[in-house]
């Protein structure tokens, strides 16, 4: 059975940059310790343009981050440098919290229903939960797990609340 890990937005700006946190750095270490155990790893990258502050998200979160082709946009080296044994590696750019690529990927990925899709990353309460729920919608019978210690939220309370939402939608929190 193949092992699939979806790593949400583990980018410099979210780990050590403008929106970084100690919790994100801990999550990064936890992911790095296990990333080579997976056959397939899919990284997502939050991707914004120079007009970010003019977008709806920019108005609610007026902190420029993950601007395409900047150092902050790049996936953290602690993970990129550890994927040497991963057979299938993908990077998906997204311009909002979640991506509907899971719809086409879920049709195209040769994943049987016995395969577990595991998800982790930042921010638990924004992009991780969004992508987990989109994945659940496209794969209603798939076993999906979220690694709680491989995630970081905007706060401890928000992280915990997002984990509860995922559990209520039959995403196992491990």
Say what each PLM segment does:
Residues 1-91, 154, 160-168, 172:
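Active-site acidic carboxylates
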Residues 106-110, 159-164:
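Short, surface-exposed amphipathic charged segments that create phosphate/polyanion-binding patches used
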Residues 118-123, 141-156:
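A short glycine-rich beta-strand->turn/loop micro-motif centered on a GG-aromatic cluster
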Residues 69-126:
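Internal catalytic-core helix/loop-beta-alpha segment
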Residues 53-55, 102-104, 130-131, 157-158:
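Short, well-ordered secondary-structure micro-motifs
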